[in-house]
Structures are given as structure tokens and as C-alpha cells.
């Protein structure tokens, strides 16, 4: 029998009695955000809304984005990345488990010096892929052109954020490259490995 999302007590400032809220809402109030699924428009919009709201609420307190994601759609992932760059508070990114594909792109988008992975986390980078393999030739060519533009954008961002030359990043993105937390640190995707 599923238990659903656990509830925890939360007392708003100035209130005597605590109310029960789901654990994620409680953590959001502490500026702790979670990407624990495939990146799609729905989770992207939720995270963007939370980052903007929390930034407006208090632009001096940092945000913390915990990532355990197999990746997902490019455009919603880039939207999360762009929002992280746009909001005034620093966004710490923390990889727990897996940050693959767009998950690693969002991970590298955290404030430089504030990107972290747990010791046994895995990070994977690769080039963006197409979902339209059975499209007509004309549609396929248009999509291929768009994919090349997206790949160029992602390569530039990885290069800027990691300090690696573009040719190194481009070469790494040719195939799935899995890294340990230590390897991701050496690659410049994260800055610190959490101590066990």
C-alpha cells in the first residue's frame, strides 16, 4: 500500500499551532529544491516557478538544487539552467545518485565553487539526441539543423563552466561519458566531492 508523500509539521512564524505539509513543501520553504526525475516541461516549470518565487521572497539567501535525474528534454533543461543564471541568489547544485544528460547540464550550471556531488554519485555527459527517427526527410533535416545548434550551445556552456577547451568538451560529448564524483570534479563539472 503506497504511503504517498510523507507529511511533516510546519509552524509559520507567529503561529502557535503547526500544520502538516508534505515534506517537499517544507523543504522548499528552507530553499531546498529537488530534481528527482526526467527533465520535462512540467518539472521545469515547477522548478523555475520556485526559483523565481524564492528569489523574489529573499534575494540574499542561496538556493540548493538536489539532482538525481537521468536527463530528459533539452529545452526544458536549458530553461532551468537559464533561470539559475537569472535569479539573484546563488544556486548550489548537489548531485546525489545520478546527473545524466540534461541533469549534468543543470549540475554544471550551479554557482561556480558551489557545485557538489556525493562520493558515490555518477555524472554522464553526451550530445543531445533526436526523438524523431521516423520523420519525413524534410522534417528530419530541419530537426538535424536544430540539433546542431543545440549541441553548439551546450558545448559552449560546458566549456565556459568547466574551463575545458571546446574541442575537449565536443570530443567528450560524442558518446556517453560516465564519471565518478572525483572524475567529474577533475573535469570541472563540480567543484567539490562531499566527504563521507
Curated annotation (Swiss-Prot):
Listed EC numbers: 3.4.21.92
Family membership noted in the UniProt record: Belongs to the peptidase S14 family.
Record key words, sorted: Chloroplast, Hydrolase, Plastid, Protease, Serine protease
Coiled coil residues, start to end: none
Domain of life, source organism: Eukaryota
A molecular function (GO) term: ATP-dependent peptidase activity
Listed transmembrane segments: none
Catalytic activity annotation: Hydrolysis of proteins to small peptides in the presence of ATP and magnesium. alpha-casein is the usual test substrate. In the absence of ATP, only oligopeptides shorter than five residues are hydrolyzed (such as succinyl-Leu-Tyr-|-NHMec, and Leu-Tyr-Leu-|-Tyr-Trp, in which cleavage of the -Tyr-|-Leu- and -Tyr-|-Trp bonds also occurs)
Record protein name field: ATP-dependent Clp protease proteolytic subunit
Top enzyme class: hydrolase
A matching Pfam family: CLP_protease
Active site (catalytic residues): 101 (nucleophile), 126
Keyword rRNA-binding carried by entry: no
Listed CDD domains: S14_ClpP_2
Function: Cleaves peptides in various proteins in a process that requires ATP hydrolysis. Has a chymotrypsin-like activity. Plays a major role in the degradation of misfolded proteins.
The keyword Hydrolase is annotated on this UniProt entry: yes
GO annotation, biological process: protein quality control for misfolded or incompletely synthesized proteins
Cellular component annotations (GO), alphabetically ordered: chloroplast stroma; endopeptidase Clp complex
Subunit-structure text: Component of the chloroplastic Clp protease core complex.
PANTHER family: ATP-DEPENDENT CLP PROTEASE PROTEOLYTIC SUBUNIT (PTHR10381), CHLOROPLASTIC ATP-DEPENDENT CLP PROTEASE PROTEOLYTIC SUBUNIT 1 (PTHR10381:SF15)
InterPro entries found in the cross-reference section: ClpP (IPR001907), ClpP/crotonase-like_dom_sf (IPR029045), ClpP/TepA (IPR023562), ClpP_His_AS (IPR033135), ClpP_Ser_AS (IPR018215)
Localization annotation: Plastid, Chloroplast stroma
Primary location class: plastid
Amino acid at each position: 500500500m503506497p504511503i504517498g508523500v510523507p507529511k511533516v509539521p510546519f509552524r509559520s512564524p507567529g503561529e502557535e499551532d503547526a500544520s502538516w505539509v508534505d515534506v517537499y513543501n517544507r523543504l522548499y520553504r528552507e530553499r531546498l529544491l529537488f530534481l528527482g526525475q526526467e527533465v520535462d516541461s512540467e518539472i521545469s516549470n515547477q522548478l523555475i516557478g520556485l526559483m523565481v518565487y524564492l528569489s523574489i521572497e529573499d534575494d540574499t539567501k542561496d538556493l540548493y538544487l538536489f539532482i538525481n535525474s537521468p536527463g530528459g528534454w533539452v529545452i526544458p533543461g536549458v530553461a532551468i539552467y537559464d533561470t539559475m543564471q537569472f535569479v539573484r541568489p546563488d544556486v548550489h547544485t548537489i548531485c546525489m545518485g545520478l546527473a545524466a544528460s540534461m541533469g549534468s547540464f543543470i549540475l554544471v550550471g550551479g554557482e561556480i565553487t558551489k557545485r557538489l556531488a556525493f562520493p558515490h554519485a555518477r555524472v554522464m555527459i553526451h550530445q543531445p539526441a533526436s526523438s524523431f527517427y521516423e520523420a519525413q526527410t524534410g522534417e528530419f533535416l530541419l530537426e538535424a539543423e536544430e540539433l546542431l545548434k543545440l549541441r553548439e550551445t551546450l558545448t559552449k556552456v560546458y566549456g565556459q563552466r568547466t574551463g575545458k577547451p571546446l574541442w575537449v568538451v565536443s570530443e567528450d560529448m560524442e558518446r556517453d561519458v560516465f564519471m565518478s564524483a572525483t572524475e567529474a570534479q577533475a573535469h570541472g563539472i563540480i567543484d567539490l566531492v562531499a566527504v563521507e
